[in-house]
Amino acid sequence: MVFYFTSSSVNSSAYTIYMGKDKYENEDLIKHGWPEDIWFHVDKLSSAHVYLRLHKGENIEDIPKEVLMDCAHLVKANSIQGCKMNNVNVVYTPWSNLKKTADMDVGQIGFHRQKDVKIVTVEKKVNEILNRLEKTKVERFPDLAAEKECRDREERNEKKAQIQEMKKREKEEMKKKREMDELRSYSSLMKVENMSSNQDGNDSDEFM
């Protein structure tokens, strides 16, 4: 089971936030995450793994402040220890930066690059945020592997279409260049022929 929430910013369209039911489900989320996903977790404490799905073309720097705080509050609220504390640090990083090795426990992860891990602090619990998110909560039983494959297939098709379009433009540009070269060559030839014709005419005048 995966829990889905919707977060909105004043200046942007809605974002999807999701998290697993337990650490075993977190394994599937880690395995089948998307490049657009940002992972959140309470720093140095046990908590839920919360993911924010960015819009295509966005990166971690583009997360609206309101959406960032929604994710941070949701993580804090789903930490047995963190939910009782103030000034809780929440770490977040792109899904692609998560590192999972065979010797790690269920639900445990590391990072490929520590420099790509950011921190946001939740000073205290804000019920208004949690109540708003709770109203958007939906429980689903998704086929994460199938959804990931569908996403990847769409990306491959988009890239294929872009390559085809690029080749088409290159072909058109080459054709245009060839036509221009032929036109210049023809114009140059006509100029030479005209000069030759004029010279022939002058020679004839001299013999008359």
From Swiss-Prot:
It is a single-pass membrane protein. The chain crosses the membrane at residues 67-83. GO terms for biological process: positive regulation of cell motility. Residues 21-25 are annotated as: DNA-binding. Residues 148-184 have a biased composition (Basic and acidic residues). Transmembrane receptor that senses neutrophil extracellular traps (NETs) and triggers the ILK-PARVB pathway to enhance cell motility. NETs are mainly composed of DNA fibers and are released by neutrophils to bind pathogens during inflammation. Formation of NETs is also associated with cancer metastasis, NET-DNA acting as a chemotactic factor to attract cancer cells. This is Coiled-coil domain-containing protein 25. It comes from Homo sapiens (Human). The lineage of its organism: Eukaryota, Metazoa, Chordata, Craniata, Vertebrata. The gene is CCDC25.
